[in-house]
């Protein structure tokens, strides 16, 4: 198969879908790999490194989309890329379709077969291709929040860990999944007073065991959520419903009870955000204020640390990527976890959470793949 990796074009996105190490694996499986020139500059991999790994260097993204049967990316295709996708092509990347009707329309119109990293599952019920970026985003959320809390950046002017004789900042983490765990770990490591809210009592017990009393865990009732949000200096939104739009847990009305110049970091913004007042921002313009509360809602947070995140992502995506390149649609038909990753196929939505969020009919992957 001809496998192509275009350069990412989203604002300040420096990751790359294929590292040179991944290219070597595809080539070893007998595939032709095309990489757009300068696609790897953000991770310190030049064209020579890709050529040495066995890739052919394409002069433009147009060449990649025209020549290749399978496109491997990091972020969702941008409008300029939708028009270049075609019927019969495989797209393997993050999609986050539930809050994005325009991208969904573009993928439907193209006829492409689109596999979303964020909905591929594993035997334990986890999301193995989302997990590494959730780990990165969770840790980055605390770095970003700590920076936004500085007075010069519009924040309260508090240090997360405090100093002897001065109380540390209070951090509330909404959601105890992978993002929440890593946000709490980073915040607690800096000495902050951390609370995690979640609706799963088994998960709260796990977190209690992991942190051994270094953080507080609370069942996420309306009252508990209000109490934590109203008293926090930094609030991390870390809620995920796989494939679906994030629930709006913190309303506009609740902002009035929050501390002025407190900070929200909405890691769930890729799925629409879990704060009613959230809208996506960029690394070049990351924050805005609503009712005196600073909002940080960058939709591609791991793109800020591409050397770490691109390699972590490739470690996770390579196995399924090779299966797709080796066996095409048959790989999806034969693997329930890849079928869970299938979001769009030949103009039909195959993810029920996406279909429900956007008002489409959902088709079972098995009913549309037509693999003999």
Walk through the language-model features, giving the residues of each.
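Adenosine-phosphate binding glycine-rich loop
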Residues: 118-159, 269, 274-372
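Rossmann-like adenosine-cofactor binding region
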Residues: 209-291
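An N-terminal-biased, well-structured beta-alpha scaffold segment characteristic
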Residues: 2-110
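Short glycine-/small-residue-rich Rossmann-like dinucleotide-binding loops
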Residues: 69, 75-76, 95-96, 221, ...
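Glycine/serine-rich phosphate-binding loop and adjoining beta1-alpha1 elements at the start
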Residues: 2, 8, 79-169, 298-300
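Residue-level detector of alpha-helix initiation sites
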Residues: 76, 136, 177-178
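Glycine-rich phosphate/diphosphate-binding loop of Rossmann-like nucleotide-binding domains
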Residues: 6-45, 152-240, 287
């Amino acid at each position: 198969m001809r496998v192509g990796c275009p350069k990412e074009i989203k604002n300040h996105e420096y990751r790359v879908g294929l590292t040179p190490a991944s290219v070597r694996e595809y080539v070893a499986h007998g595939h032709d790999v095309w990489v757009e020139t300068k696609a790897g500059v953000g991770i310190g991999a030049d064209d020579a490194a890709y050529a040495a790994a066995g890739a052919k260097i394409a002069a433009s993204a147009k060449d990649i989309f025209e020549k290749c049967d399978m496109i491997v990316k990091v972020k969702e295709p941008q409008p300029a890329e939708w028009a270049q996708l075609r019927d019969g092509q495989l797209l393997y990347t993050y999609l986050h379709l539930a809050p994005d009707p325009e991208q969904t329309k573009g993928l439907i119109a193209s006829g492409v077969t689109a596999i979303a990293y964020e909905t591929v599952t594993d035997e334990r019920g986890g999301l193995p291709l989302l997990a590494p970026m959730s780990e990165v985003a969770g840790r980055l959320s605390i770095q970003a929040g700590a920076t936004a809390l500085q007075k010069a950046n519009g924040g309260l002017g508090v240090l997360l860990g405090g100093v002897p004789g001065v109380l540390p900042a209070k951090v509330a983490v909404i959601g105890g999944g992978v993002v929440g765990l890593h946000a709490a770990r980073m915040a607690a490591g800096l000495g902050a007073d951390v609370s995690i809210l979640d609706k799963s009592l088994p998960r709260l017990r796990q977190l209690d065991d992991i942190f051994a009393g270094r953080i507080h865990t609370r069942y996420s009732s309306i009252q508990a959520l209000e109490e934590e949000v109203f008293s926090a200096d930094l609030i991390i939104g870390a809620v995920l419903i796989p494939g679906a739009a994030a629930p709006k847990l913190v309303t506009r009305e609740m902002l009035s009870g929050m501390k002025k110049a407190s900070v929200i970091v909405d890691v769930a913004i890729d799925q629409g955000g879990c704060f009613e007042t959230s809208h996506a921002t960029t690394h070049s313009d990351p924050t805005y204020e609503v009712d005196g509360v600073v909002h940080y809602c960058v939709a591609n947070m791991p793109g800020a640390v591409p050397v770490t995140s691109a390699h972590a992502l490739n470690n996770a995506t390579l196995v399924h990527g090779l299966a797709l390149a080796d066996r095409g649609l048959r790989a999806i038909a034969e693997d329930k976890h890849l079928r869970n990753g299938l979001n769009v196929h030949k103009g039909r939505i195959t993810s029920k959470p996406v279909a429900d969020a956007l008002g489409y009919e959902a088709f079972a992957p098995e009913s549309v793949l037509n693999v003999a």
